[in-house]
């Protein structure tokens, strides 16, 4: 279980275990905490592998087509491909932002260009609540 919630850490837990083995594998492959990947999936798609956002983001980790191309994702609705591609992208962002988790998560949500343009976390309500 991962402590998360709209008010911050500790207000609710993620109990969906369906993808735990895939998450653990991707976490080991990309040197990420499994809890981080699981929290992103919970926030992005609520564990719905068929989720599609208004912006066109797809799958468990809600990857937009341009990012899918960047990380080599062929089928965004395949949980294995999506979790590994989303985890790869998280690793890319963490490397780009020198391990700054807040900036990396904001970039995952709003796009890395928004972080650079805002000189930090952009003032979008969705990103601030992310």
What are these regions (language model features)?
Residues 2-130:
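Catalytic glycan-binding domains that act on GlcNAc-containing polysaccharides
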């Amino acid at each position: 279980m991962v402590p998360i919630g709209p008010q911050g850490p500790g207000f609710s837990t993620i109990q969906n275990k369906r993808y735990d083995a895939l998450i653990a594998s991707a976490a080991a492959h990309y040197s990420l905490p499994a809890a981080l990947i699981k929290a992103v999936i919970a926030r992005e798609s609520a564990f719905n592998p068929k989720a599609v956002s208004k912006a066109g983001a797809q799958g468990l980790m809600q990857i937009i087509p341009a990012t899918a191309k960047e990380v080599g994702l062929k089928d965004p609705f395949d949980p294995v491909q999506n979790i590994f591609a989303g985890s790869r992208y998280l690793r890319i962002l963490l490397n780009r932002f020198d391990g700054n988790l807040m900036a990396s998560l904001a970039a995952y949500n709003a796009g890395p260009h928004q972080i650079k343009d805002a000189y930090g976390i952009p003032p979008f309500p969705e990103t601030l609540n992310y």
